[in-house]
Amino acid sequence: MSGRFISFEGPDGAGKTSVLTAIRTGLVNQLGDQVVYTREPGGNPIAEQVRAVLLDKQNGAMDDWTEALLYAASRRQHVVETLKPALEAGKLILCDRYLDSSIAYQGGGRELGIDRIWELNQYAIDGLLPDLTIFLDLPVETGLARIEKGRAETINRLDEQTTNFHRRVRQAYLTLAERFPERIVKVNADQELARVIEDVRSAIHARYADLFTN
C-alpha cells in the first residue's frame, strides 16, 4: 500500500482533538483531498453504530470483554471499509485513536492484559499498524481536571471511570511507547496548546520530510 498512516493517541484530557484539528488543517492546506481524517471507534456507518453503543452512559452494565470485543469488531470494519482502501489509493490517513487505545483502555484500564488485547486485535487489524503514532502524554490529574472544566457536557462512559482506571490507562500507553519506540513518538501535552501543536508538527516532519515544510 502506497499511502501513509498516522494515528493520534493519549489519555483523556490530553487535548488530542484540538491538536488533531490543527494538524489536519495544516495538512489539508498542503495536500488537499489527499488527507483522510477518521476516528475510532467509528470511521464508517457500521463502526459509528458500534461507537454509539460503546460510549452510551446507559450501558454501564457492559461486561469488560464485551467492550473489548466490540472495539475490535468496530476496528475490523474500519480497517476493511475505510483504512485499507484509503492507503491503497495513496492517501495520508490521520486517525483519532486506533489499536493502542484498546490496549491502553481495555488492556490497562480494565486490567484485561496488554498482551491479551494485542492478540485479540490481530484478527481486527490484519497486520495493519500505523507508520507513525503521536502519543500525547500528561499527568492523569491534569487530564481529568481539563475534562471536568472544558467538556463536562460531553463526558462519556469511559470518561466516568475512576482515577486509578485512568492511571492504568496512562501506564499502558507508556509501556507501549517503550515497546514500540520506532513507531510511537511521545509528546508532552502538559504545556500550552500552541507548543504541543508545534511539537507534533516537528515529530511528523521528522518522519516525513515533505510534510510541514514551512
Swiss-Prot record:
UniProt keyword annotations, A-Z: ATP-binding, Kinase, Nucleotide biosynthesis, Nucleotide-binding, Transferase
InterPro entries: P-loop_NTPase (IPR027417), Thymidylate_kin-like_dom (IPR039430), Thymidylate_kin_CS (IPR018095), Thymidylate_kinase (IPR018094)
SUPFAM superfamilies linked: P-loop containing nucleoside triphosphate hydrolases
Tree of life domain: Bacteria
Record EC number: 2.7.4.9
Reaction(s) catalysed by this chain's protein: dTMP + ATP = dTDP + ADP
Transmembrane residue ranges: none
Binding site for ATP: G10, P11, D12, G13, A14, G15, K16, T17
Record-level GO BP terms: dTDP biosynthetic process; dTTP biosynthetic process; dUDP biosynthetic process
Pfam families to which the protein is assigned, alphabetical: Thymidylate_kin
Gene Ontology cellular component annotations, sorted alphabetically: cytosol
Signal peptide residue numbers: none
GO molecular function: ATP binding; dTMP kinase activity
Known function: Phosphorylation of dTMP to form dTDP in both de novo and salvage pathways of dTTP synthesis.
HAMAP family cross-referenced by the UniProt entry: Thymidylate_kinase
Matches recorded under PANTHER family: THYMIDYLATE KINASE (PTHR10344), UMP-CMP KINASE 2, MITOCHONDRIAL (PTHR10344:SF4)
Similarity comment text for this entry: Belongs to the thymidylate kinase family.
Name of this protein: Thymidylate kinase
Species of origin: Limosilactobacillus fermentum (strain NBRC 3956 / LMG 18251) (Lactobacillus fermentum)
